Amino acid sequence: MSPVLAGVLQLLALTAALALAHVPLGNYLARVYSSPKHLRIEKWIYKSIGADPDTEMRWPAYLRGVLAFSLAGVLFLYLLQRLQGVLPGSLGFASIDPDQAFNTAASFVANTNWQSYYGEQAMGHVVQTAGLAVQNFVSAAVGIAVAVALVRGFARSRTGELGNFWADLVRGVVRVLVPIAAVGAVILVACGVIQNFSGIHEVGQFMGGTQEWNGGAVASQEVIKELGTNGGGYFNANSAHPFENPTPFTNLFEIFLILLIPVALTRTFGIMTGSVRQGYAILGTMAAIWAGFVALMMWTEFAHHGPALQAAGGAMEGKELRFGIGGSSLFAVTTTLTSTGAVDSFHSSYTGLGGGITMLGMMLGEIAPGGVGSGLYGMLVMAVVAVFIAGLMVGRTPEYLGKKIGTREIKFAACYILITPALVLVFTAAAMALPTPGDSMTNSGAHGFSEILYAYTSASNNNGSAFAGLNADTQWFNSTLGLAMLLGRFVPMVFVLALAGSLARQQPVPATAGTLRTEKPLFAGLLAGAVLIITGLTYFPALALGPLAEGLAA
């Protein structure tokens, strides 16, 4: 079988699996976040944290819950790393340095999972399981909760109440993430992913000498790493490591886990707003962008430029033979168009244009289909902008789902869109202008600039993947990337929740003959165009200096 055909068949199998899961999981999520009943274990959790799950919150109270919970998570994870040297199950690893502990705590709480450390050489069992794995669950649940709050803003009228953050958080963990992760972990273990608490083993090599291998609770962390679009690997090689991702089947299964909840949430959006077709319009836009990026990436990496690449079947540098170009390209596009950041190949080794595609996927805002929760609310904000643009073109007040998009709403949407590019470009410019950050660059020229641009794009968009040529374990990068991750995660949430509160207070406007039909393919095309044009205008100069210059020079 040719590598191209193998890649196409994987794409078709993945699409079929997602299509089968879309309706039942989307319906289930709608029931979870609409049910007035609480499970017994949920009641125990509410009692233990002193929360009243039946109290409705306005957007400032909802935001305070998000920020307070996340701040507590940062402090706990920071202290856990700083105390690792005296904790049991540390495997003899020392405590983490302050700047790296801050970076890692910010990274995992912000659902970014940027890693400036070698997982198997720095983190013991306690930090991995009680710290990092726990944040993989709760940070994903926070993202879903904020997305559901925005959906309620569209669905509700004449009220400022958006639900209860603590109830949404707990339900996301207990009813959604834990059950799916439990089943997924069993599947991964059955396919060869390790799950144990063994120590460090010294093994012999075929060519002589010895090598140290770590055990660990890898399968349980691997599944939520993908399902929660987190991305932080147990091992430094991430999902390229055979202990995390041993076969082509596990590779495809992990891609399925990454896309599962973001795709299903579009169905949940349609059900909760009373129009399933609106959900399909959003899903269609996401799917079209994702499919276009996959096709472009495969074409770029399969393109033959000389006899060596032709003999290898394409650009195989940095890719695992067991996955090939098809599986690697599919994973790379999926992980950067969502907020996952896990890798089964090394993006720095992709062709110049291939690396640019991964970077552009993050620059879009990771909304196709995006991260768990963050993808949906990011695309809905872009839908508000697209409706506003359409209203300007026809000269009537823009409306979306029966809600008027006025000055207040478009200001919130504009602030949401501007915050991430500002972080990316300001931090990148500072790193390039100052002498110290440049010492961390392995490469010079266009590729060296791409390493810096990729790092801040990844951090600010809460992705976490990296161009491996950059040494990010320095005080400058640990501090600035950590700050970018926190600001890139929580400042946009402020505007999302403010937008939700503004929409929820409105009275529905009845549709008329002149109302834009936002469930039609025409609007989906307008939405996709708005996403691509806004991103292109914002980032094109930076992309021209980095991946485009490198790709065109090749």
UniProtKB/Swiss-Prot annotation:
Q: Does the keyword RNA-binding apply?
A: no
UniProt keyword Transmembrane present: yes
Any Pfam family the entry gives: KdpA
Q: Which controlled-vocabulary keywords does the entry list? A: Cell membrane, Ion transport, Membrane, Potassium, Potassium transport, Transmembrane, Transmembrane helix, Transport
What protein family is recorded?
A: Belongs to the KdpA family.
Name the job this protein performs.
Answer: Part of the high-affinity ATP-driven potassium transport (or Kdp) system, which catalyzes the hydrolysis of ATP coupled with the electrogenic transport of potassium into the cytoplasm. This subunit binds the extracellular potassium ions and delivers the ions to the membrane domain of KdpB through an intramembrane tunnel.
Q: Which GO terms describe its biological process?
A: potassium ion transmembrane transport
Which pairs are disulfide-linked? Answer: none
User: Where does this polypeptide localize?
Assistant: Cell membrane
Assembly with partners or alone: The system is composed of three essential subunits: KdpA, KdpB and KdpC.
**Residue ranges crossing the lipid bilayer per the database entry:** 3-23, 60-80, 131-151, 174-194, 252-272, 279-299, 323-343, 352-372, 375-395, 412-432, 481-501, 522-542
Can you name one GO molecular function term for this protein?
potassium ion binding
Q: Which GO terms describe its cellular component?
A: plasma membrane
- PANTHER family cross-referenced by the UniProt entry: POTASSIUM-TRANSPORTING ATPASE A CHAIN (PTHR30607), POTASSIUM-TRANSPORTING ATPASE POTASSIUM-BINDING SUBUNIT (PTHR30607:SF2)
Q: Which InterPro entries match?
A: KdpA
Q: How does it sit in the membrane?
A: Multi-pass membrane protein
Q: What is this protein called?
A: Potassium-transporting ATPase potassium-binding subunit
